[in-house]
Curated annotation (Swiss-Prot):
NADP(+) binds at residues 8-32. It comes from Sinorhizobium fredii (strain NBRC 101917 / NGR234). This is Uncharacterized short-chain type dehydrogenase/reductase y4eL. The active site is at 157 (proton acceptor). It comes from the Bacteria.
Length: 248
Protein backbone atom coordinates (compact mmCIF):
# COMPACT_ATOMS: atom_id res chain seq x y z
CA UNK A 1 0.00 0.00 0.00
CA UNK A 2 3.03 2.25 -0.24
CA UNK A 3 2.28 5.68 -1.64
CA UNK A 4 -1.49 5.37 -1.15
CA UNK A 5 -3.68 7.85 0.73
CA UNK A 6 -6.48 6.19 2.71
CA UNK A 7 -9.57 7.35 4.61
CA UNK A 8 -10.93 5.21 7.45
CA UNK A 9 -14.37 6.10 8.79
CA UNK A 10 -14.88 4.95 12.37
CA UNK A 11 -11.14 4.45 12.62
CA UNK A 12 -10.52 5.93 16.06
CA UNK A 13 -11.19 2.72 17.97
CA UNK A 14 -12.00 -0.97 17.69
CA UNK A 15 -11.86 -2.67 14.33
CA UNK A 16 -11.46 0.56 12.40
CA UNK A 17 -8.34 1.45 14.37
CA UNK A 18 -6.94 -2.05 13.92
CA UNK A 19 -7.40 -1.68 10.17
CA UNK A 20 -5.65 1.69 10.21
CA UNK A 21 -2.72 0.15 12.10
CA UNK A 22 -2.23 -2.54 9.48
CA UNK A 23 -2.35 0.02 6.69
CA UNK A 24 0.32 2.06 8.44
CA UNK A 25 2.33 -1.15 8.84
CA UNK A 26 2.06 -1.70 5.09
CA UNK A 27 3.41 1.74 4.30
CA UNK A 28 0.49 3.95 3.29
CA UNK A 29 1.65 7.49 2.62
CA UNK A 30 -1.20 9.31 4.37
CA UNK A 31 -4.16 8.11 6.40
CA UNK A 32 -7.17 10.17 7.42
CA UNK A 33 -9.12 8.85 10.41
CA UNK A 34 -12.72 10.09 10.56
CA UNK A 35 -14.72 9.70 13.77
CA UNK A 36 -17.29 11.49 15.90
CA UNK A 37 -15.19 11.39 19.09
CA UNK A 38 -12.30 13.86 19.34
CA UNK A 39 -10.77 12.22 22.41
CA UNK A 40 -10.59 8.85 20.68
CA UNK A 41 -9.19 10.51 17.55
CA UNK A 42 -6.40 12.09 19.56
CA UNK A 43 -5.56 8.74 21.15
CA UNK A 44 -5.65 6.97 17.78
CA UNK A 45 -3.35 9.54 16.23
CA UNK A 46 -0.87 8.88 19.01
CA UNK A 47 -1.00 5.12 18.37
CA UNK A 48 -0.55 5.51 14.62
CA UNK A 49 2.13 8.21 14.63
CA UNK A 50 5.87 7.73 14.32
CA UNK A 51 5.85 4.93 11.77
CA UNK A 52 6.46 6.87 8.56
CA UNK A 53 2.84 7.61 7.64
CA UNK A 54 1.32 11.08 7.84
CA UNK A 55 -1.69 10.90 10.16
CA UNK A 56 -4.67 13.24 9.89
CA UNK A 57 -7.91 13.25 11.85
CA UNK A 58 -11.37 14.62 11.08
CA UNK A 59 -14.07 14.87 13.73
CA UNK A 60 -17.50 14.63 12.12
CA UNK A 61 -20.87 12.93 12.51
CA UNK A 62 -21.53 11.09 9.24
CA UNK A 63 -25.18 10.32 10.04
CA UNK A 64 -26.36 13.10 7.74
CA UNK A 65 -25.25 14.05 4.24
CA UNK A 66 -23.63 17.35 5.17
CA UNK A 67 -21.43 15.74 7.83
CA UNK A 68 -20.41 12.84 5.62
CA UNK A 69 -19.55 15.01 2.63
CA UNK A 70 -17.75 17.56 4.80
CA UNK A 71 -15.65 14.80 6.37
CA UNK A 72 -14.58 13.44 2.99
CA UNK A 73 -13.89 16.93 1.66
CA UNK A 74 -11.68 17.52 4.70
CA UNK A 75 -9.86 14.25 4.03
CA UNK A 76 -9.14 15.31 0.45
CA UNK A 77 -8.06 18.79 1.54
CA UNK A 78 -5.53 17.42 4.02
CA UNK A 79 -4.30 14.29 2.23
CA UNK A 80 -4.94 14.90 -1.46
CA UNK A 81 -6.23 12.11 -3.67
CA UNK A 82 -7.87 9.34 -1.64
CA UNK A 83 -7.11 5.95 -3.19
CA UNK A 84 -9.23 3.86 -0.82
CA UNK A 85 -12.06 4.60 1.59
CA UNK A 86 -13.02 2.19 4.38
CA UNK A 87 -16.28 2.54 6.30
CA UNK A 88 -16.71 0.79 9.66
CA UNK A 89 -19.61 1.47 12.05
CA UNK A 90 -21.36 0.79 15.35
CA UNK A 91 -22.36 -2.46 17.04
CA UNK A 92 -25.09 -2.13 19.69
CA UNK A 93 -27.29 -4.91 21.09
CA UNK A 94 -30.95 -5.01 22.13
CA UNK A 95 -33.51 -7.80 22.70
CA UNK A 96 -35.64 -8.39 19.61
CA UNK A 97 -38.89 -7.17 21.18
CA UNK A 98 -37.31 -4.15 22.85
CA UNK A 99 -35.76 -2.21 19.96
CA UNK A 100 -36.92 1.39 20.33
CA UNK A 101 -37.47 3.99 17.63
CA UNK A 102 -34.38 5.82 18.86
CA UNK A 103 -32.32 2.66 18.50
CA UNK A 104 -33.62 2.12 14.97
CA UNK A 105 -32.99 5.74 14.03
CA UNK A 106 -29.42 5.69 15.35
CA UNK A 107 -28.63 2.38 13.67
CA UNK A 108 -30.11 3.40 10.34
CA UNK A 109 -28.47 6.83 10.44
CA UNK A 110 -24.94 5.52 10.91
CA UNK A 111 -24.91 2.13 9.24
CA UNK A 112 -27.15 2.82 6.24
CA UNK A 113 -27.36 6.56 5.62
CA UNK A 114 -23.83 7.28 6.80
CA UNK A 115 -22.35 4.50 4.69
CA UNK A 116 -24.41 5.62 1.69
CA UNK A 117 -23.30 9.25 1.95
CA UNK A 118 -19.65 8.29 2.44
CA UNK A 119 -19.83 6.12 -0.68
CA UNK A 120 -21.39 8.98 -2.65
CA UNK A 121 -18.61 11.33 -1.56
CA UNK A 122 -15.89 8.78 -2.31
CA UNK A 123 -17.28 7.82 -5.72
CA UNK A 124 -17.57 11.45 -6.85
CA UNK A 125 -13.97 12.05 -5.81
CA UNK A 126 -12.70 8.87 -7.47
CA UNK A 127 -14.57 9.55 -10.71
CA UNK A 128 -12.43 12.65 -11.05
CA UNK A 129 -9.30 10.48 -11.20
CA UNK A 130 -10.42 8.03 -13.85
CA UNK A 131 -7.58 6.94 -16.15
CA UNK A 132 -7.57 4.33 -18.89
CA UNK A 133 -6.50 0.93 -17.62
CA UNK A 134 -6.18 2.02 -13.99
CA UNK A 135 -8.30 1.55 -10.89
CA UNK A 136 -9.80 4.93 -9.97
CA UNK A 137 -10.31 4.01 -6.34
CA UNK A 138 -11.47 1.35 -3.91
CA UNK A 139 -14.24 1.40 -1.31
CA UNK A 140 -14.57 -1.24 1.41
CA UNK A 141 -17.62 -1.35 3.67
CA UNK A 142 -17.49 -3.36 6.88
CA UNK A 143 -20.66 -5.43 7.14
CA UNK A 144 -21.20 -8.54 9.26
CA UNK A 145 -21.98 -12.22 9.08
CA UNK A 146 -25.21 -11.14 10.79
CA UNK A 147 -26.34 -9.87 7.37
CA UNK A 148 -26.57 -13.51 6.26
CA UNK A 149 -27.62 -15.29 9.47
CA UNK A 150 -30.42 -14.93 12.02
CA UNK A 151 -29.30 -12.93 15.06
CA UNK A 152 -32.26 -12.21 17.37
CA UNK A 153 -30.03 -10.49 19.95
CA UNK A 154 -28.96 -7.92 17.39
CA UNK A 155 -31.68 -7.82 14.74
CA UNK A 156 -31.63 -4.08 14.02
CA UNK A 157 -27.86 -4.15 13.50
CA UNK A 158 -28.14 -7.24 11.28
CA UNK A 159 -30.85 -5.58 9.18
CA UNK A 160 -28.71 -2.51 8.55
CA UNK A 161 -25.71 -4.62 7.60
CA UNK A 162 -27.85 -6.55 5.10
CA UNK A 163 -28.83 -3.17 3.67
CA UNK A 164 -25.16 -2.22 3.32
CA UNK A 165 -24.50 -5.46 1.44
CA UNK A 166 -27.23 -4.47 -1.01
CA UNK A 167 -25.92 -0.91 -1.32
CA UNK A 168 -22.42 -2.23 -1.94
CA UNK A 169 -23.64 -4.37 -4.83
CA UNK A 170 -25.65 -1.52 -6.35
CA UNK A 171 -22.77 0.96 -6.16
CA UNK A 172 -20.32 -1.61 -7.52
CA UNK A 173 -22.55 -2.29 -10.52
CA UNK A 174 -23.20 1.40 -11.19
CA UNK A 175 -19.61 2.60 -11.00
CA UNK A 176 -17.61 -0.29 -12.42
CA UNK A 177 -17.53 1.72 -15.65
CA UNK A 178 -15.52 4.34 -13.75
CA UNK A 179 -13.08 1.70 -12.49
CA UNK A 180 -14.16 2.21 -8.87
CA UNK A 181 -13.99 -1.15 -7.05
CA UNK A 182 -16.55 -1.43 -4.24
CA UNK A 183 -16.70 -4.43 -1.91
CA UNK A 184 -17.53 -5.37 1.66
CA UNK A 185 -15.86 -7.48 4.32
CA UNK A 186 -18.20 -9.37 6.65
CA UNK A 187 -16.64 -10.67 9.87
CA UNK A 188 -18.10 -12.89 12.53
CA UNK A 189 -17.62 -11.92 16.17
CA UNK A 190 -14.27 -10.37 16.99
CA UNK A 191 -12.33 -10.11 20.22
CA UNK A 192 -12.44 -6.31 20.27
CA UNK A 193 -11.92 -4.38 23.48
CA UNK A 194 -15.64 -3.64 23.53
CA UNK A 195 -16.53 -7.33 23.19
CA UNK A 196 -14.13 -8.11 26.02
CA UNK A 197 -15.55 -5.41 28.28
CA UNK A 198 -19.11 -6.62 27.67
CA UNK A 199 -18.15 -10.22 28.47
CA UNK A 200 -18.98 -11.57 25.00
CA UNK A 201 -15.85 -13.65 24.38
CA UNK A 202 -17.22 -16.84 25.92
CA UNK A 203 -20.41 -16.58 23.89
CA UNK A 204 -18.47 -15.92 20.69
CA UNK A 205 -16.10 -18.82 21.32
CA UNK A 206 -18.97 -21.23 22.02
CA UNK A 207 -20.70 -20.25 18.76
CA UNK A 208 -17.65 -20.72 16.56
CA UNK A 209 -16.33 -24.09 15.32
CA UNK A 210 -12.77 -22.82 15.82
CA UNK A 211 -13.57 -22.30 19.49
CA UNK A 212 -12.63 -18.63 19.67
CA UNK A 213 -13.51 -15.19 18.41
CA UNK A 214 -11.38 -13.71 15.65
CA UNK A 215 -8.65 -11.29 16.57
CA UNK A 216 -9.43 -7.93 14.89
CA UNK A 217 -6.11 -8.03 13.02
CA UNK A 218 -7.07 -11.35 11.42
CA UNK A 219 -10.11 -9.72 9.81
CA UNK A 220 -8.35 -6.44 9.07
CA UNK A 221 -5.87 -8.30 6.85
CA UNK A 222 -8.73 -8.98 4.43
CA UNK A 223 -9.71 -5.30 4.41
CA UNK A 224 -6.13 -4.37 3.58
CA UNK A 225 -6.13 -6.86 0.71
CA UNK A 226 -9.44 -5.68 -0.77
CA UNK A 227 -8.54 -1.99 -0.35
CA UNK A 228 -4.99 -2.40 -1.62
CA UNK A 229 -3.26 -2.32 -5.00
CA UNK A 230 -3.37 -6.10 -5.48
CA UNK A 231 -7.14 -5.86 -5.93
CA UNK A 232 -7.50 -4.80 -9.54
CA UNK A 233 -10.62 -6.74 -10.56
CA UNK A 234 -12.89 -7.73 -7.67
CA UNK A 235 -15.97 -5.57 -7.20
CA UNK A 236 -19.47 -6.09 -5.81
CA UNK A 237 -18.29 -8.96 -3.61
CA UNK A 238 -18.78 -9.78 0.05
CA UNK A 239 -15.67 -11.26 1.65
CA UNK A 240 -17.07 -13.34 4.51
CA UNK A 241 -14.52 -14.17 7.22
CA UNK A 242 -16.13 -16.15 10.00
CA UNK A 243 -14.18 -19.21 11.09
CA UNK A 244 -17.03 -21.50 10.03
CA UNK A 245 -19.56 -19.71 12.27
CA UNK A 246 -22.35 -19.46 9.68
CA UNK A 247 -22.24 -23.23 9.15
CA UNK A 248 -22.33 -24.16 12.83
Amino acid sequence: MQGMNIAVVGGASGFGLETAKLMVRDGVSKIVVIDINQERLDAAKGELAGKGTEIFTVVRDIARAEGAHASFDAAVKTAGRIRSSICAAIYPRAPLLEITDDMWDAENAINIKGTYHMMVAAVKHMQGHKAEGEVSGRIVNITSVDAFKAHPQNAHYAATKAAVVSLTRSFAHAFAKDQVLINSVAPAGMATEKAKSLGFLGELAAANPLGRAAEPAEIAEFVVMVAGPKNTYMTGEQVIVLGGYIYA
